[in-house]
Each structure stands twice: as structure tokens, then as C-alpha cells.
């Protein structure tokens, strides 16, 4: 069987604009981009927007913005054009009609006039007889109700085995006789997924189809369409493992917030960290290395080391990877990336806080929690007498020091040494007095980021608020 030149790698993703951008879309896009860039190939974005009821233009925009944020830019697509456009399925309806007409004319497809009630009755009968359901081919026989005006178009499954190569799972084989004649054109004239997708893949010369494992069962039907039309098959497929929630269930848009790609941007995850994590979610590099630049991923990635089973999402691992990326940013870049998350602070204040924040942030949004005391006035804590005394002692040593982290640190450490209580017991009431929280940046920065008079005022207020 003819196949395209394997040296001309062309891959694609084909998301549907029916809701927010899903984490799985980003994962699939990443693996496609890595494969394309490693082979000097082309990455195509196609929009599968034939679901008339659920598609929204704004969701298509969300797909673009999310992929751009991750740096997963495409070479051809609806907004860029290309030699095999249009790249929206809703703009390719004539293409599908022509191909369906051809299959009908060649006897490889037929009109089905069965109503939904009649099809439901067939399914119930199959259930009662405890056999897998497949369409009865009633409309191929003399009893077909051809006087009806509403019909679908079904593909006439030829039978036999459908074989293909999966770069993750190896040689695959399906018995097409178990599939049954499937609908390729719905009663409203729109194509089904298993018809439009292979027609587009063939027309766009897609060499490798890389997608989630939920599409594995679709592959035999799609290859039968390709064969019936006489087109070249893709060189190979790769069906990636599903991303699972921590409890092992499938990641759901309704139940699992981590499935929403926009969440990561809003929470302050760095796009390069998200890509790094997604690459490791189902792929093992075979070494102890866990932090990869994009170029390193391009060179290291291979489908041979992708696991077959689902990959469980792990917030702790993502937070660790994101923290590693944050720590590698220089002061200027970290300041710039923090600014959208700290709109109440000026650039100079953020820059002063950066050295204290760098090692404490699992995500950029966490900076707002740590620095909230800078734009709020937390109530004075109710301290035990001994703790209030420690705050009073701090006021005494801080009154005369230059208001810089190093000087504050030296004076407070002298207080620690004098009291013999240790840093934690000495600093906790000071921290509570200034921020209202038990967690903040290092105490020297916590104080220095406030104007001196404000910091001392809060300390005095707390020292007088004894339980």
C-alpha cells in the first residue's frame, strides 16, 4: 500500500471549539510539535467545528490564545492559511459532500432511512439476545423505506482485518466485521467525525496521526474510509495515554479544574514549566533528568518511551517543576512575570521583594498571598504576654537600624542570641504583628518591604494588644 514520503513529516491537532481549552489538547499539541520539530516537519492546526449546537467562535479564540501562551505555534491553520486550507471543517462541507457522493456512486456507501426509534429497537433486540449491536443493513435490502425524505449516509464496511502501526503500541489489528456499517453523513448533511477526519488528514497530507488513546477505536473506521477513497494512509499513528485525575478517573471538564488549561495561566504557572510537566506525564526520558528546555525535549523525546496506561495528574510534581523554573529566572524577568499578579504594587517594590520570593513560590499567584500585607492593614493579633514582650524587644532594637534587610537581619539575630529562644519563637509574633499571618517572606524582608513607620506602628499596636 502506498504511503507518503516519511521524510516529509506533517502532523496536526484538530480541537473542537465547544468549551474551554482542555489540558489534553495541550498535551496532544506538545507531542505533535516535538515530533514535527525533531523531523523538520510541519505542524497543522485544524478546527473541527462541525458540532453546530456547541461550537462558539470565542472558544476557538481560547484555543489560539492557550496554544500561543504555551509557545506551541502552528505552521498552518485557520488564521495563517496554507496550501491545504481551509482549516475549519465548517468551511469544508463541499469537500465532504463530494467524497460522500463518490462513495455512494461506487457502492461503498448507501442511504439509511431508518428512524431513531427503529435503530433503538434494533439495539434493544441485540441486548436481549446478548450480542454486540451492529446495524442490520436493512436499508441495503428491498425493504428499505426509500419513500422517506430524511436519511443518513452509511459506509458499507467491507469486512476483513484492518491493520496499522502504532508508534506506542506496536502492530495493531481490528476485525472490521465487528464494527458494522457506520454513519458518515448525518441527517442534517454534516459529516461525522469518523468521516471528516480521515478525509481531511488525507487531503492535508498528514503523515503521522498523534492523538489521545480515546481515538484508538476510531482508527479502523477511519482507515477503511481512506482505503475506500484510494488515498494514502498515514505512515503511522500514535495514541497517547489518557491524562487521569489523581484518583485514577478520566480527567473531566466538569469534575476536575485541572483539566482547564486557562487555570494554569491564571494561577501563575510558567508556560515552559507546564510543557515540561506535560512531557513527563506519560513519557519517561530514561534518565534522572526532570527539567528540560524545549530544545532538550525535542532531542530527547521518543514514542518508544511513552507508557501505554493512563498518566495520573500530580499537583505536587507540577508545583515542584514550576518552582524550579521560577528559581532559574533572573531578577528582571521574575519581576516582569510577577507584575500581573501584584497589580497593587509598583515595579520597584516587586523588584525589592524578588530575592525573598524566588525560593518560596510554587506558582506566581502565591506571591499575592505572601505580600498581601503590603496593601492591607491586618488587625492586631491577640498575643500572649511573653510573645508581646518579644515584639516590644524587637521594637527597641529596630528603632535605630537602617531600614534594609541586612541591617534588620543583624539586629534581630542579636535579639535571638540574647533571648536564647531561637528564631522561630522570636520571629513568629513579629510576623503575626506585621502581616497577620504565620507565613511570610523572611522576616528581614517582611519588615523592610514596609515603610519603617508603618512596620513599627503595627509592632507597637501588637505589643499593646495582650491576651
Residue ranges and their predicted role:
Residues 2-127, 218-232:
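N-terminal Rossmann-like or analogous alpha/beta NTP/dinucleotide-binding catalytic cores
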Residues 6-12, 256, 295-302, 336-340, ...:
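Short amphipathic alpha-helical segments and their helix-coil junctions
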Residues 11-17, 45-49, 204-209, 259, ...:
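Glycine- and acidic
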Residues 32, 63, 103, 107, ...:
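Residue-level signal for inorganic ion chemistry
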Residues 52, 229-232, 236-381, 435-467:
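Catalytic adenosine-cofactor/nucleotide-binding cores of aminoacyl-tRNA synthetases and other
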Residues 110-239, 244-251, 260, 264, ...:
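Active-site cores that bind ATP or allylic diphosphates and position pyrophosphate for catalysis
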Residues 385-434:
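C-terminal accessory/binding modules appended to enzymatic or scaffolding proteins
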Amino acid at each position: 500500500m502506498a504511503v507518503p514520503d516519511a521524510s516529509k513529516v506533517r502532523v496536526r491537532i484538530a480541537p473542537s471549539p465547544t468549551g474551554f481549552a482542555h489540558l489534553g489538547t495541550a498535551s496532544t499539541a506538545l507531542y505533535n510539535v516535538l515530533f514535527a520539530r525533531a523531523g523538520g516537519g510541519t505542524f497543522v492546526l485544524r478546527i473541527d467545528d462541525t458540532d453546530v449546537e456547541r461550537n462558539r467562535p470565542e472558544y476557538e479564540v481560547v484555543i489560539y490564545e492557550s496554544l500561543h501562551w504555551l509557545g506551541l505555534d502552528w505552521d498552518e491553520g485557520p488564521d495563517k492559511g496554507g496550501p491545504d486550507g481551509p482549516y475549519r471543517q465548517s468551511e469544508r462541507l463541499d469537500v465532504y459532500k463530494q467524497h460522500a457522493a463518490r462513495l455512494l456512486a461506487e457502492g461503498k456507501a448507501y442511504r439509511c432511512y431508518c428512524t431513531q426509534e427503529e435503530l433503538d429497537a434494533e439495539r434493544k433486540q441485540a441486548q436481549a439476545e446478548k450480542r454486540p449491536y451492529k446495524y442490520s443493513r436493512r436499508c441495503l435490502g428491498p425493504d428499505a423505506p426509500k419513500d422517506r425524505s430524511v436519511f443518513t449516509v452509511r459506509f458499507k464496511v467491507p469486512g476483513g482485518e484492518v491493520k496499522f502501526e502504532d508508534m506506542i503500541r506496536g502492530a495493531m489489528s481490528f476485525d472490521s466485521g465487528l464494527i458494522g456499517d457506520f454513519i458518515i453523513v448525518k441527517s442534517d448533511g454534516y459529516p461525522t467525525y469518523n468521516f471528516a477526519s480521515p478525509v481531511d488528514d488525507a487531503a492535508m497530507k498528514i503523515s503521522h496521526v498523534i492523538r489521545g488513546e480515546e481515538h484508538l477505536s476510531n482508527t479502523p473506521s477511519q482507515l477503511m474510509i481512506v482505503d475506500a477513497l484510494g488515498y494514502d494512509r498515514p505512515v503511522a499513528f500514535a495514541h497517547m495515554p489518557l491524562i487521569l485525575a489523581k484518583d485514577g478517573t478520566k480527567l473531566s471538564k466538569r469534575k476536575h479544574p485541572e483539566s482547564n488549561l486557562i487555570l494554569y495561566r491564571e494561577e501563575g504557572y510558567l508556560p515552559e514549566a507546564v510543557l515540561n510537566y506535560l512531557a513527563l506525564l506519560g513519557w519517561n526520558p530514561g534518565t534522572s533528568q526532570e527539567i528540560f528546555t524545549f530544545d532538550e525535549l525535542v532531542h530527547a523525546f521518543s514514542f518508544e518511551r511513552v507508557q501505554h496506561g493512563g498518566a495520573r495528574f500530580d499537583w505536587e510534581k507540577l508545583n515542584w517543576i514550576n518552582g524550579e523554573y521560577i528559581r532559574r529566572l533572573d531578577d528582571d524577568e521574575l519581576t516582569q512575570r510577577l507584575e500581573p499578579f501584584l497589580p497593587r504594587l509598583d515595579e520597584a517594590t516587586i523588584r525589592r521583594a524578588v530575592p525573598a520570593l524566588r525560593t518560596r513560590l510554587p506558582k506566581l499567584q502565591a506571591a499575592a498571598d505572601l505580600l498581601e500585607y503590603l496593601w492591607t492593614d491586618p488587625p492586631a493579633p491577640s498575643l500572649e504576654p511573653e510573645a508581646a514582650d518579644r515584639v516590644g524587644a524587637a521594637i527597641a532594637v529596630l528603632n535605630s537600624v537602617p531600614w534594609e534587610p541586612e541591617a534588620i537581619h543583624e539586629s534581630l539575630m542579636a535579639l535571638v542570641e540574647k533571648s536564647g529562644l531561637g528564631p522561630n519563637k522570636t520571629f513568629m509574633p513579629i510576623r503575626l504583628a506585621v502581616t497577620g499571618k504565620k507565613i511570610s517572606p523572611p522576616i528581614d524582608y517582611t519588615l523592610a518591604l514596609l515603610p519603617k513607620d508603618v512596620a513599627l506602628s503595627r509592632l507597637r499596636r501588637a505589643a499593646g494588644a495582650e491576651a
